[in-house]
C-alpha cells in the first residue's frame, strides 16, 4: 500500500513541477507575477522591455511595458502545503485502516459482540409494505359497514402500526357514525 502511494505522490509532484519548469522546487516554493506594483525588480534590461518575448523567455513577468522578476507566492505555497498535508494524511489513514482490518481479521475479531447478537435479525420483523398480506389485512372496513364478528387469527394486525391498520374493541375508523 505504501509502495503505491509514494510513487503516486511523486508522479503528482513531477507533473506539477514540469508544468512551470521549476521542477519539484516549484511545488514547495512557487513563484508568481502577482504582488505590489511598486515593489518590482527589473529583469533583462532595456532589450527585455522592448521585446516581451525575450522577457518571457527569461522567465520574467511582462506587464504594462515593464519586464520584472517573479516573486515567491506565499498564498500558492500555503495551498500546496495544505493539499500535500491532506493527501499524506488521507493516505496514512487509509493504510492504517487497511492494516487494522487485516490484523483484526487474522485474530478473528470481526464478529459482533455478544450484546449485539440477535438484535439485527431482520427476518422476524413484519413489513407494512409486504405483498404477502391477505386481502382482509390490506384494508380494514369501518365498523358500521359490516356486522361485528369474532376475529380470526389471520385477521389480527400485529405490526404495531399507528395509522389505522387495525381496530381495537369498539373503535371506529374513517367511516364516522353511520348508524343514523
Curated annotation (Swiss-Prot):
Cellular localization per UniProt: Membrane
Topological domains, Extracellular: 22-81
InterPro entries xref list: P_trefoil_dom_sf, TMEM190
Regions of compositional bias (Basic and acidic residues) in chain numbering: 131-140
Primary site of residence: membrane
Acidic residues: bias regions: 165-180
Highest taxon of source: Eukaryota
Residues passing through the membrane, by range: 82-102
Name of the featured protein: Transmembrane protein 190
Organism of origin: Bos taurus
Amino acid at each position: 500500500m505504501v509502495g503505491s502511494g509514494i510513487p503516486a505522490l511523486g508522479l503528482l509532484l513531477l507533473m506539477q513541477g514540469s508544468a512551470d519548469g521549476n521542477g519539484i522546487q516549484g511545488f514547495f516554493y512557487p513563484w508568481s507575477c502577482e504582488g505590489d506594483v511598486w515593489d518590482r525588480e527589473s529583469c533583462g534590461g532595456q532589450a527585455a522591455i522592448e521585446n516581451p518575448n525575450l522577457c518571457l523567455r527569461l522567465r520574467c513577468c511582462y506587464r504594462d511595458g515593464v519586464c520584472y522578476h517573479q516573486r515567491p507566492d506565499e498564498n500558492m505555497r500555503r495551498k500546496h502545503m495544505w493539499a500535500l498535508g491532506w493527501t499524506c494524511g488521507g493516505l496514512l489513514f487509509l493504510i492504517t485502516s487497511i492494516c487494522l482490518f487485516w490484523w483484526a481479521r487474522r485474530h478473528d475479531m470481526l464478529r459482533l459482540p455478544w450484546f449485539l447478537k440477535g438484535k439485527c435479525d431482520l427476518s422476524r420483523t413484519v413489513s407494512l409494505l409486504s405483498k404477502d398480506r391477505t386481502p382482509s389485512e390490506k384494508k380494514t372496513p369501518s365498523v358500521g359497514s359490516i356486522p361485528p364478528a369474532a376475529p380470526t387469527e389471520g385477521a389480527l394486525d400485529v405490526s404495531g402500526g399507528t395509522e389505522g391498520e387495525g381496530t381495537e374493541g369498539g373503535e371506529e375508523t374513517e367511516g364516522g357514525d353511520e348508524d343514523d
